[in-house]
Amino acid sequence: MQVGLAAIFFGFLATNVVFADDSEGWQFVQENGRTYYKKGDIKETDWRVIDGKTYYFDYNGEMVVGWQYIPMPVKGYTIGPYPNGIRLEGSPMPKWYYFDENGVLQEFVGWEELELKDSLTVGKKHGEGWEGPEVLKLAYYYFDQDHSLKTGWLYDQSNWYYLAKKGDSGNKNLGGERRVGWINDGSAWYYLDSETGIMQTGWKQLGNKWYYLRSSGAMATGWYQDGSTWYYLDNKNGDMKTGWQYLGNNWYYLRSSGAMATGWYQDGSTWYYLDNKNGDMKTGWQYLGNKWYYLRSSGAMTTGWYQDGSTWYYLNASNGDMKTGWFQVNGNWYYAYSSGALAVNTTVDGYYVNYNGEWIQ
């Protein structure tokens, strides 16, 4: 069969134009601004291969162009409109295909940059007049071996990509386009390179914030251990936290690198102790390195005189460790028991200390 196309374009066409004829009497005909493939009054519908090119004619026999959501023919099945809009068991599922301005199925396989699939470019018929946008929006799409459009996750040449699905969060288009930036596939957040669309993993700085993307690409939240170092990533937004953070009824300090601090930490002129394993800020009496320290409710290490109930203690002015035995402060001698409690109104080693604990010579 040889069927030639003449003067076909995506726009208005003259009516009742016979484009070509063949020995069986089939011909392309333009009627009422639409294009049909007819033999007498019989209009072809569904898929048709004409002169080696594939076309699709809808249930009215109108030839389609642009983006179309239609079933691909499967051997042994008759393709047509679903009764009452219901797909019969065993009939092929519809897929997305792209037809050029002449109605020819584009037998794409792999990546193609095409007009954006949206309400302006979907479901058009050959000869249908419409005014597209002044600036054509383009997007990258991926086509399978049967020339149908793929959606969802795609693994191609050692990289992962995400091809939008209709109804995806934050996506107003009809799906299939290669996404970039942040996307949520319904299970987790992912970041796709802003230019290539390749799924990112590992540490990633975006704007002024850091994020960690697991080997699966999923954005990490909450506590995350990298080697021997712990980090905290916002439980909702995933951005890495720094500075003081109150988490689960405990305070933590995260350095400018995001690494959780442990052990002694100096903030300005104040010292704090952060659990050597868990990193939570300690308060109250703490026995560290064979010495006692007192950390206030704020976590700040106490120095100098400290009263606990009716008992006084003296904590070294320079390093905060609790004094025991005889010690001197501002020219006065004092005695603290092994518990650290200051001796008052008593005699120690033959020396009398008054109600302030001062040795009276």
Language-model-detected regions and their locations in the chain:
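Extracellular adhesion/carbohydrate-binding repeat motifs centered on closely spaced tryptophans
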Residues: M1-Q361
